[in-house]
Amino acid sequence: MRWHHLFGLVFGIITFTWIFSGLMSMNPWKIFDSGAPKLNINAYQAGELDALHFPLSIQKALIAFQATGFYPRELEWQLLDGKGYYIGFDNNGQSRILAAETNATPFKQFAWQQLENAATRLMGASKPSASSILTDYDIYYYQRAAHTMTGHIEKRLPILRLEFDDAYSTWLHIDPYTGNVTKLDAYKRISRWLFAFLHSWDWVPLLNSRPLWDSLMIIFSAGGLMVSASGIIIGWRRLKRKLA
């Protein structure tokens, strides 16, 4: 009992936050669903993604990429402002963009103003209340190690963040290397704190201070294990006395 109380005093709050954040990961009662309408990607693209926007063949696109010393291993289609683009990725994860037209030259990223104009169309009557280019990670946009939670999602820098004055306080993150858009409304930002932060302590200064983060996670996990194990032992002893 004494050890259970001691471990509980030191690690009880951490253990509770992990239990609570684990519950939040299930989105109970859909509390993190804002009800906001889905993004109208066709409005962002100014058209529907189809082969008509890609008059340049894949073979010629590969030749154009390779002519600049870039050797793609994967190609994606992107439509922006009604114009087709090939997004090429090499075996190192680097990317280049090529307009799907004759005599086009590969380039690294879309223009910021082009992306902002296209993204604004997504939100209809709502206009950006703030626009910023992130060159460093922050509490809402950050990269995790590949083997950790959400680490498989690549978060490149810089990116464009647009904050809107709509009813859902929507933020858009636009990747200039691909033109891809992700949405983060007020409900998802709350989820970021109640689930992701409390569950993995993925605060950017901590993530940048490994192995400090690893050491804390090991200590917290061991403490939580001792609280749980000592509680099981106490419960088992009481059960034995009742059954005796």
Question: What positions do the PLM features span?
Answer:
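Conserved histidines in hydrophobic membrane contexts and catalytic metal-binding motifs
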Residues: M1-A244
